[in-house]
From Swiss-Prot:
It comes from Rhodospirillum rubrum (strain ATCC 11170 / ATH 1.1.1 / DSM 467 / LMG 4362 / NCIMB 8255 / S1). The keyword Amino-acid biosynthesis does not apply. Coiled coil: none annotated. Pfam families: Bac_DNA_binding (PF00216). This is Integration host factor subunit alpha. PROSITE patterns: HISTONE_LIKE (PS00045). The gene is ihfA. It comes from the Bacteria. One of its GO terms (cellular component) is cytosol. Belongs to the bacterial histone-like protein family. HAMAP family: IHF_alpha. Heterodimer of an alpha and a beta chain. The lineage of its organism: Bacteria, Pseudomonadati, Pseudomonadota, Alphaproteobacteria, Rhodospirillales.
């Protein structure tokens, strides 16, 4: 397991190398995809990417938590959280250690 982080610039470079668009076009394409995903999630929609997984926003209600140091009850306000659910194919690839191979689906 390498544990490295893939950046936006690296994704853009990968699009450039694989698709053959210019570097600027590749960066713009990636930016448009990420913006569309972000907008959909902000509106409460689910973003499903076949053979990869789905992103959704879940509403968490108000609840009572505790300060671990004092034991004092503290209200935790309602909020929205981002959830990612990987596809079965992605789960299988991760568990099989098929790092670097292409997802075909």
């Amino acid at each position: 397991m390498s544990g490295k982080t893939i950046t936006r610039a690296q994704l853009s470079e990968a699009v450039y190398q694989e698709v053959g668009l210019s570097r600027n076009e590749s960066a713009d394409l990636l930016e448009m995809v990420l913006n569309e995903m972000s907008e959909a999630l902000v509106e409460g929609d689910t973003v499903k990417i076949s053979s990869f997984g789905s992103f959704s926003v879940r509403e968490k209600g108000e609840r009572v938590g505790r300060n671990p140091k004092t034991g004092e009850e503290v209200p935790i306000l309602p909020r929205r959280v981002l959830v990612f659910r990987p596809s079965q194919l992605l789960k299988a690839r991760i568990n099989d250690g098929a790092v670097g191979s292409q997802i075909n689906g």
